[in-house]
Amino acid sequence: MKVVAFERSLQGTGASRRLRNSGKTPGIVYGAGAETQLVELDHNALWHALKKEVFHSSILDLEVAGKSQQVLLRDVQYHPFRQLVLHVDFQRVDAKKKLHTKVPLHFLNQETNPAVKLSSAVISHVINEIEIECLPSALPEFLEVDLATIEAGHSVHAKDIKLPAGVTLVAHVEAENPVIAAATIPAGAIAEGEAAAAEGEGETPAA
């Protein structure tokens, strides 16, 4: 995904405020052993780009002064109550060095899960993104979590995710193996099932 930015020379609260008033958003580009670069981006274009999942989870081609560099979006600061992006941070990508970054999880086959269809189970998504490690060339836009066979009372953990070649969970996620999704039967559904069973047991067989 291509992103266009422009060099800026002024920094500080006053300069940033003037930028925002003119429809621009200040940002920085850092990393890969190069100097930090001050940039500005068109606010409206940035606002719409930020609504796309791919903008947050993939390598971006950032063009500044006619030169393109590969970056990851690392931080976004929003105004607390206005639809306004205050600042963005981009990190340069080194093709030979592994990245530590978070990618979104896409949950599949929840609606067709037997526990959901037959037992009124509810599947909760405990986390919606997970931290991985890989070379830039192997970075996936998202990871899929198949919920087709999860049973009521059971859960899916981080280590259950099928990872693409060259992608691993970061060490602390691997060690903790957190719950990704869990299937439970609501108390109301359990009570209804017990009541129906009791009615069935209480019926007198026909002579």
Swiss-Prot record:
Gene3D superfamilies: Ribosomal protein L25, beta domain, Ribosomal Protein L25, Chain P
Any GO CC annotation of this UniProt entry: cytosolic large ribosomal subunit
Keyword field contains RNA-binding: yes
One BP term from GO: translation
Subunit record text: Part of the 50S ribosomal subunit; part of the 5S rRNA/L5/L18/L25 subcomplex. Contacts the 5S rRNA. Binds to the 5S rRNA independently of L5 and L18.
Domain of life according to the entry: Bacteria
Keyword list, A-Z: Ribonucleoprotein, Ribosomal protein, RNA-binding, rRNA-binding
SUPFAM superfamilies noted in UniProt: Ribosomal protein L25-like
A GO MF term: structural constituent of ribosome
Function of the molecule: This is one of the proteins that binds to the 5S RNA in the ribosome where it forms part of the central protuberance.
Cytoplasm found in the keyword field: no
Protein name, entry field: Large ribosomal subunit protein bL25
Family: Belongs to the bacterial ribosomal protein bL25 family. CTC subfamily.
HAMAP family: Ribosomal_bL25_CTC
